[in-house]
């Protein structure tokens, strides 16, 4: 399976978030990549901050890769899990640009763990992962049917 892992371009203009505005490595996506590649999947990992790509450019790169599944983070890094940005505008913007060209979609991060239904509605993803995402993402990639994958939520 082809899987795209995306850390959107986080910006804080007009944001009510007062946390650290410096870019951080998306460790959870790196761990996902390692597990997915071990299982034989083809993985594209993109980080808007490190690669200086806006969300439209990220979406174009994902679409060119033509993945079967796209995973997007709802917080800039695990460092933000305890105090995540309250809004979902950044991942929502990326998904809007992706416009259905990324296969099935999954969101990982604190929002899906704390408020899965609103996260699903606001992002329009197929599934949110609740809790630690690495092994769950690997399991999603290995299954055709997602309804029985534990630690996920769907509408």
Predicted regions span which residues?
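Glycine-rich beta-alpha loop elements in corrinoid/cobalamin-binding modules
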Residues: 28, 32-155
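Residues that mark the start of a beta-strand
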Residues: 2-3, 42
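Short glycine-rich His-centered loop
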Residues: 3-21
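Short glycine-enriched, charge-decorated loop/helix-capping segments at active-site entrances
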Residues: 18-23, 84-86
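Short low-complexity stretches enriched in small and charged residues
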Residues: 3, 23-31
């Amino acid at each position: 399976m082809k899987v795209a892992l995306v850390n959107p371009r986080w910006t804080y203009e007009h944001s009510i978030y007062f946390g650290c505005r410096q870019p951080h490595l998306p460790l959870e996506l790196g761990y996902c990549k390692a597990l997915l590649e071990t299982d034989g999947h083809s993985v594209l990992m993109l980080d808007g901050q490190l690669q200086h790509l806006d969300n439209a450019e990220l979406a174009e790169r994902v679409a060119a890769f033509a993945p079967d599944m796209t995973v997007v983070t709802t917080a800039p890094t695990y460092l933000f899990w305890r105090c995540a940005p309250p809004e979902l505008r950044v991942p929502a913007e990326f998904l809007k640009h992706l416009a259905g060209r990324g296969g099935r979609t999954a969101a990982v991060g604190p929002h899906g763990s704390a408020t899965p239904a609103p996260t699903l509605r606001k992002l329009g993803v197929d599934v949110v992962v609740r809790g630690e995402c690495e092994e769950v993402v690997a399991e999603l990639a290995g299954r055709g049917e997602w309804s029985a994958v534990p630690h996920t939520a769907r509408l």
